[in-house]
UniProtKB/Swiss-Prot annotation:
Protein species of origin: Hydrogenobaculum sp. (strain Y04AAS1)
PANTHER family the record matches: SERINE HYDROXYMETHYLTRANSFERASE, SERINE HYDROXYMETHYLTRANSFERASE 1
UniProt pathway annotation: One-carbon metabolism; tetrahydrofolate interconversion; Amino-acid biosynthesis; glycine biosynthesis; glycine from L-serine: step 1/1
Subcellular location(s) of the protein: Cytoplasm
Signal peptide residue numbers: none
The protein, known as: Serine hydroxymethyltransferase
């Protein structure tokens, strides 16, 4: 390996991370494992090329081959999600959201998004984020009775505040979202509807979660998470907004696009069109449902009583530990999750009363329902009966699962510390 000889410190860190991914159960809902083909595209010579502008309308010469790549990514994104227009240049989901806002909103305009404390995202109007600083953000949330989105509240807030844009989508909401209802509410006050489908994009591509594309003015997303691509973003819109969106991305919010990442996105979109990916998306949801059911059997409080997606939200208050403690305990056992606030959480975001658990990465490794049943029992034991003996047994079970479902065997044979 060239890197090993040139910079062993970086090489060793990469090798250690490969070993960590291989030897832990990755259950952070926003993480996944890309294919080697996607990594190959992202590590290609396209990283050398500047290509400001759009395909065939560049501000630099020598773009004939990167134009081919970006054209492929655009056409595949449109085909995959049945969209009229696609811009594949945003470097991230946050930048995709920023570009949409800046395309049709002015500073001080009112936006109505899901409360971060109830499962929304920073870029949907959180006060600590640019979206909450530039725009007048109002928040809808979930009902305390069942933790499902309160569409009646959304309607009342829309009528009261007359937002210029309503934002759908979430980072911690396990159930199906009624996009059509959101569009109905948006239309009632003359607002745009933007849906951030970052968490659900792979499930939507696989046909196991409702698509927001037809009913939304704008749809943004990341390409990692359930879509299993590189860490990046893209925007879908109606054709009437195409020019405004493209100008808002460049020169509005970004300079040169990352052509090596766009190549990886093109590969990602092609992979997501396959029958294998549809089966994968279905398995992700089935795994999450079984995981939720088994956790409930073990006395773990699963919010909303289950899931329709790739994630399971757990309220730990009946166990008497915080999300931070749970994250650390499971990490000691070899299971990676993240602490997560639950709706109406009395604890600060640095501690939280819950954790978020996801199945995309383990499903990529080939794990199915039987493995989810085993993992649910491990999680419950570690959370409820924390001891060195419990941890030791959990580590052994995790090791057995990881060895039975190896990750990146080709790389592991090449890279070792």
């Amino acid at each position: 390996m060239l890197l090993k000889a040139k910079d062993k410190e970086v090489y060793d860190a990469i090798a250690s991370e490969l070993n960590r991914q291989n030897s832990y159960l990755e259950m952070i809902a926003s993480e996944n494992f890309t294919s080697l083909e996607i990594m190959e595209a992202q590590g290609s010579v396209l990283t050398n090329k500047y290509a400001e502008g759009l395909p065939h309308k560049r501000y630099y010469g020598g773009c004939e081959y990167v134009d081919i790549v970006e054209d492929l990514a655009i056409q595949r994104a449109k085909e995959l999600f049945k969209a009229e227009h696609a811009n594949v240049q945003p470097h991230s989901g946050s930048q995709a959201n920023m570009a949409v806002y800046m395309a049709v909103l002015k500073p001080g305009d009112t936006i109505l998004g899901m409360s971060l404390a109830h499962g929304g995202h920073l870029t949907h109007g959180a006060t600590v984020n640019f979206s909450g600083k530039i725009y007048n953000a109002v928040y809808y949330g979930v009902r305390e009775s069942d933790y499902l989105i309160d569409y009646d509240q959304m309607y009342k807030l829309a009528k009261e505040h007359k937002p210029k844009m309503i934002i759908g989508g979430a980072s911690a909401y396990p159930r199906v979202i009624d996009w059509a209802k959101m569009r109905e509410i948006a239309d009632s006050v003359g607002a745009y509807l933007m849906v951030d489908m970052a968490h659900y994009a792979g499930l939507i591509a696989g046909g196991v979660y409702p698509s927001p594309v037809e009913v939304s003015h704008f749809v943004t997303s990341t390409t990692h998470k359930t879509l299993r691509g590189p860490r990046s973003g893209f925007i879908l819109s109606k054709q009437e907004f195409a020019k405004d969106i493209d100008k808002s991305v460049f020169p509005g919010t970004q300079g040169g696009p990352l052509m090596h990442v766009i190549a990886a996105k093109a590969v990602c979109f092609k992979e997501a069109m396959s029958d294998e990916f549809k089966q994968y998306a279905q398995q992700v949801v089935e795994n999450a449902r079984v995981l939720a059911e088994e956790l409930l059997k073990e006395g773990i409080n699963v919010l909303t009583g289950g899931t329709d997606s790739h994630m399971v939200l757990v309220d730990l208050r009946n166990i008497g530990i915080t999300g931070k403690e749970a994250e650390n305990r499971l990490g000691e056992a070899g299971i990676t999750v993240n602490k997560n606030a639950v709706p109406f959480d009395p604890l600060p975001p640095t501690k939280t009363s819950g954790i978020r658990i996801g199945t995309p990465a383990l499903t990529t490794r080939g794990m199915k329902e039987d493995q989810m049943k085993i993992i649910a029992k491990i999680i419950a034991k570690v959370l409820k009966n924390y001891s060195e003996d419990t941890l030791q047994k959990a580590r052994e079970q995790v090791k057995d699962l990881c060895e039975a479902f190896p990750l990146y065997k080709e790389l592991k044979d090449e890279i070792c510390v």
